[in-house]
C-alpha cells in the first residue's frame, strides 16, 4: 500500500489501528517479560523454513535477504514485532511509547541471540542458544554427520542429522565382508559335509574294531602261549638226550656259521640247552639263554642276552659278563690274531648296534622255531657223502673163448 492511500484514511481508522497495535505489543511484551523458560523446539513452520534453507544450500546459491528476515520473524516469542516496528519507523508514525520500546529491545535481543551456522555454499540451519533468565547459555553442538567417504557435513533440522539420500550407500567394513566370504567358503556344500560326517563315523568304527582285534590277539596269545610252553618243554628234554645237538645246528646254519671261528665251534659243542623267552604278551622284548656244561673256557653256566624297550622307547640290550678262565678269553685271542674275524661270544658284550643285530634276528625267527631242520642237514650231508664214497659192485668181464684143437 502506498503512502498516498495511507494518508486518505480517516482519523478514526488511524486511531483504531494504533490502539490495536499498542494492545498487541503490550500483551506480547508482558508475555515475553514474564517467560523465563528457554524457547521450545521449532514447530511445523520452523521445519518448513529449515527445509527451504537446506534446499538453498544444496543448490549452492546465496540466501535472499527477504528469506533471512522472514526466518528471523518466525522465531518464537517474536510474533512479528520486529517487522512491525521497522514498518512503523519507515512510516514515521512510531511514537516513543515505553511499551513499544520494550518490545523493540526484546526483538533486538532475540535477533542477537539467533546465530546462523553456514555450510559450503549456503546457510544450513539456525543455531540458537538457550536462555536462562537474562544469561545466555552456549547452544548444544550439532553432531557431525560426515560420511566415511569424506563428504561435507549434511544439513540438520532441529539438531538432528538428516538422513542421506537414497542414492548414497554407506560403505560396509572390508573386514566384515572378508569374514563373511571366508565363512561361506569354508562351510562347503551339503554333499561334502555329509561325506565328512559319514567318513568320521566309519573311521570310529574301524578304530573300535582295531581295539577289539588287539584285545582278542592278546587273549589268543596268552592261551596258545601256554599250549606252546608245554610242547617246548618236551622238545627241550628230547634235545638234551642228543649230544651236541645245538652246536651242530649252529654250525650247519648257513648264516650263523659265518660268525663262528674254530674256537667258537669248540665252545658251542658244550651247549646243552637254548631258550628264547618272549617278554610281555605283545612281544616287547626277548631274553635268550645259553645253558653250557662244564667246559675249559669260562665259569658261567648260563649266558643271557636280553633285549627290551628303555624309558624313552629306544631298544636297549643287557647281558651278563662272561667269566673267562685264564688263557681262554676268546675275545682277546681274536683281537691278537688278525686272521680271525672276531669271536661269536663278543656279541654278548656288544650293545652299540642293536637295530642292526643280525644274530638275534636269526636266532629268534629262524633257528629257535625249527632247529631240527638245521641239525638234519649234517645227517643228510653225511649220508650223501657216504653214498659217494661207498664202492659199487665190480662188473665181471667175459672170459676169452678158448679155441679147441682139431
Swiss-Prot record:
Biased composition, class Low complexity, residue ranges: 49-62
Name of the gene this protein is made from: Tspyl5
Sequence ranges of Basic and acidic residues compositional bias: 27-38, 382-392
Keywords in alphabetical order: Growth regulation
Protein name: Testis-specific Y-encoded-like protein 5
Keyword Glycoprotein: no
Subunit (UniProt): Interacts with USP7.
Sequence intervals crossing the membrane: none
Physiological role: Involved in modulation of cell growth and cellular response to gamma radiation probably via regulation of the Akt signaling pathway. Involved in regulation of p53/TP53. Suppresses p53/TP53 protein levels and promotes its ubiquitination; the function is dependent on USP7 and independent on MDM2. Proposed to displace p53/TP53 from interaction with USP7.
One of the protein's GO biological processes: positive regulation of cell population proliferation
Organism listed in the record: Mus musculus
Compositionally biased residues, Basic residues: 1-25
Annotated segments matching region Disordered: 1-67, 132-164, 382-406
Family membership noted in the UniProt record: Belongs to the nucleosome assembly protein (NAP) family.
Entry GO CC: nucleus
